[in-house]
Amino acid sequence: MSTTCPAKGTAPPASAPLPWSGLLALSTAAFTAVLTELLPAGLLPRMAPDLGVTEARIGFLVTGYALASFAAAIPLTALLRGLPRRPVLVGALLGFAVSNAVVAVSSSYALTFGARLVAGGMGGTLWAMLAGYAARMVPAERRGRAIAIVLAGITLALALGVPAGTALAGTVGWRTAFGLLSGLAVLLVGWVRWRVPGFPGETPHARVPLARVAALPGIPAVLSVTLFLLVGHQVMYTYVAPFAAHAGFGRTGLVLLVFGAATVVGIWITGVLVDRRLRPTLVGALALCAVVMLALGLAAGVPGVLLISVALWGLAFGGAPTLIQTALVDASGPERADVATSLQTTVYNAGIAVGSLTGGLALDGWGAGALPWTALPLVAVALGVTTVARNAFPATRR
């Protein structure tokens, strides 16, 4: 397994092997960011008494992180786009290390919340960089696979990292869990400096204004698909527990385990297909999501149908972000990918917020049975845009 990296600021030759060590370092950065964001959600009963607040206010630690990431992605990316890329990446990782260390030792909820805001800002910066960084490390015909490797860190964090972190905190304490997460970020700094190549920032004369990047051919379509897919997905995923109970299946943990395991398979399949069959694979994934929502709406009361549908949902959704992200980098070009991805990060977080709100309104107004019917038209819009916008989602990679 080669770990060869290209020289600083140069594109690798087409025959060069994948820089596995560098790509895995970026994937671990994605893993660390997701685990930092979501770990408090599994630790509500443990953190609340130690910080002297309710469990709901511990939940706000996740909300605050997400809002900071949403707010910081575009302005921080615009501010830092002229700097060399690797120091910015290292700075974001050091921010994770410091903020998680503060959470580990803090006895003040206000200080903990402030540390979470800092972590969210670092997360917004990191997400804007990762896909473009991966794309610059490999030849054009391998971009999709490189991005899939990096974004696999998200899937592994959701499927394995958060449950494992929650279990670890139950054994060694939540403060130790955050301390270990801080240590992981420090180790990752060394890994990045050792194996991830450096790239220059944008020169002043080469910088394209944000509005022009947003208007590049294909970008609006990619952002639209991101928004509608995330809203539809979150309508169901946020309220999967009440929906499973509505369907007469009380084992929510099993439902989430099936979904998480299927996402790992989905991203592996995507890594194989993305560079050769981007558009057909994305159309198939979105069509499968739509069929799953229809099946959940019609026959979720049958346990076998519920679990099979959830597995197919995870299979389809697991690879969709990689496919969409690859299309975004193709549309923007690797040199402008950080700016384009900052836009997508904002849209992504907006989709999560709107989807959670929409699902909550549907649940309160019509009950859990309405959730798949609410999600279905949103996923269908994403499918329709992908089908029509052939320029944004080409059948084969450019």
Feature names for model-found ranges:
Residues 109, 115-154:
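Cytoplasmic helix-loop-helix junction between adjacent transmembrane helices
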Residues 72-85, 266-278, 363:
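Helix-to-loop junctions at the C-terminal end of transmembrane segments
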Residues 71-107:
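Conserved MFS/SLC helix-loop-helix module at the cytosolic interface between two early adjacent transmembrane helices
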Residues 182-202, 385-389:
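C-terminal membrane-cytosol helix-exit motif in multi-pass small-molecule transporters
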Residues 95, 99-102, 110-119, 304-312:
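Paired small-residue
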Residues 52, 84, 105-111, 299-301:
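Helix-breaking motifs and short loop linkers at transmembrane-helix boundaries and internal kinks
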Residues 280-324:
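C-terminal transmembrane helical hairpin of 12-TM major facilitator-type secondary transporters
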Residues 126-138, 319-333:
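Intracellular juxtamembrane helix-capping segments at the cytosolic ends
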